[in-house]
């Protein structure tokens, strides 16, 4: 399994949310709303003979300008446990990530924050922790 395939699978699942642009790599100029996948940690040798590896990702969802009421409402929709705009539901919609994983789980939403994209604007976003089980 390649890390690129897993990241691409996460991007594809995220793009099942209407209007959300997924990025499997950090973009130079993301189109907002965006969901950016970054690799945090890899835990090797989780079972015998290298049969399981845990890949831990962050998915940063950026929705709009920091002071926008609609951006804050969008965050609520993305943070929901279920629904058509739920990040958790979208990521877990194909648990094999197109055949590159055994399973994927969204384990937490870790916070809402101000995000600076170096374009003169402050954006609001949140981070999700995602664990992928593969070999």
PLM regions: where:
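Charged, amphipathic alpha-helical segments and their flanking helix caps
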Residues: 1-31, 41-135
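Two-metal-ion RNase H-like nuclease active-site motif
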Residues: 37
């Amino acid at each position: 399994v390649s890390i690129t395939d897993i990241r691409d699978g996460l991007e594809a699942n995220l793009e099942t949310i209407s209007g959300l642009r997924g990025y499997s790599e950090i973009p130079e100029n993301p189109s907002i709303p965006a969901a950016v996948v970054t690799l945090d940690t890899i835990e090797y040798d989780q079972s015998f003979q290298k049969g399981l590896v845990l890949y831990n990702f962050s998915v940063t969802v950026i929705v709009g300008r920091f002071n926008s009421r609609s951006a804050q409402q969008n965050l609520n929709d993305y943070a929901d446990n279920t629904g058509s705009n739920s990040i958790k539901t979208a990521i877990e919609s194909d648990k094999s990530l197109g055949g590159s994983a055994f399973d994927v789980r969204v384990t937490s939403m870790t916070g809402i924050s101000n995000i600076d994209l170096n374009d003169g604007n402050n954006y609001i976003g949140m981070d999700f922790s995602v664990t992928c089980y593969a070999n």
